[in-house]
């Protein structure tokens, strides 16, 4: 938070003191939530501003409550809070809550805090668990992986999500019939929602006070968005598991300029649907757990235009050319597979 009068950064602790001693006197509704939950929101705001000052993120945007997923932060105040059983969970204030899905939360774990969120008509819980270093990594999972192999290069793209230098190819899940069918339904429900808004405007109603029919239609749209998102996330996790279970010595990927790619209005939607940044973040995290080094090659490295055999750079190669034909030595190969081989053998990189 920024103080306009003193022109300096105000920490979460200082702002919390201001809320307790001054702001809370005029705004009694602040007492409706717990002090630790309020402090957590201030800490999150402080973290967002620090990332902005360190050039790690853009300036924090104001997030209107009605446009955000409902999230409730519950600290552990008593010994019995956040006790985990196989089929239920002790949530502070809400008491025992049954779980729809089993096996995701560690039974008997020491929970520090948790957050309950409401997204598209469903409740989700995420918890912070205190674990020791010995059990930090899943040893049973690590031993199930194969012995270490040579390094691999991965070329990410739109036609296929990932092409690996060992010959594996992972398709674009957004081209599957299931996702296309859901996107078609989403467009139809969005048009229906838009018509309801337009109808209310013609009748002179206030859009801010939406009707019950509009709220029901919004929930349908939210559920479709959530379903498509879950399909993409599940596919990403499966792709990453298939890549790291071979346990290569290193994984080389290109440092993609996703923000620049989004400026192309013809490719922006397809690039956004591929979720490259999310995929790379998960890959780095999983590789760190297994002990695999991730190499990041500069985004200006011509991996697709370089011949893997003779090293000639084919400057006339277009995005529509799906087969790489070297004008010097005649080497012919799929352009994405050729790029993955060049990434694998790249000499200049940085360790992620």
Segments from the language model and where they lie:
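Nucleic-acid substrate recognition interfaces
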Residues: 1-352
């Amino acid at each position: 938070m920024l103080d306009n009068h003193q022109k300096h950064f105000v920490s979460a602790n200082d702002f919390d003191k201001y809320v307790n001693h001054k702001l809370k006197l005029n705004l009694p509704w602040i007492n409706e939530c717990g002090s630790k939950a309020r402090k957590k929101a201030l800490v999150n705001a402080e973290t967002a501003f620090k990332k902005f000052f360190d050039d790690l993120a853009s300036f924090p945007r104001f997030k209107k409550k009605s446009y955000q997923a409902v999230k409730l932060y519950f600290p552990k105040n008593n010994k019995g809070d956040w006790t985990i059983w196989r089929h239920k969970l002790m949530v502070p204030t809400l008491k025992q809550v049954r779980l729809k899905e089993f096996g995701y939360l560690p039974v008997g774990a020491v929970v520090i805090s948790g957050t309950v969120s409401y997204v598209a008509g469903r409740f989700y819980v995420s918890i912070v668990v205190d674990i020791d270093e010995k059990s930090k990594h899943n040893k049973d999972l690590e031993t199930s992986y194969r012995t270490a192999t040579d390094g691999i290069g991965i070329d990410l793209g739109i036609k296929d999500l990932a092409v690996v230098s060992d010959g594996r190819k992972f398709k674009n899940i957004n081209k599957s019939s299931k996702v296309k069918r859901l996107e078609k339904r989403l467009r139809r429900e969005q048009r229906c929602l838009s018509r309801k808004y337009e109808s209310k405007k013609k009748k002179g109603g206030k859009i801010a006070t939406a009707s019950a029919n509009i709220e029901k239609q919004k929930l349908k749209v939210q559920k479709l968005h959530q379903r498509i998102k879950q399909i993409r996330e599940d596919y990403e996790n499966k792709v990453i598991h298939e890549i790291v279970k071979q346990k290569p010595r290193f994984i080389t990927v290109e440092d993609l300029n996703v923000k620049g790619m989004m400026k192309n209005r013809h490719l922006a939607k397809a690039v956004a649907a591929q979720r490259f940044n999310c995929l790379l973040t998960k890959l780095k995290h999983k590789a760190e757990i297994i002990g695999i080094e991730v190499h990041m090659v500069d985004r200006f490295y011509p991996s697709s235009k370089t011949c893997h055999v003779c090293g000639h750079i084919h400057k006339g190669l277009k995005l529509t050319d799906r087969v790489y034909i070297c004008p010097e030595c005649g080497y012919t190969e799929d352009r994405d597979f050729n790029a993955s081989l060049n990434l694998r053998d790249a000499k200049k990189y940085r360790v992620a």
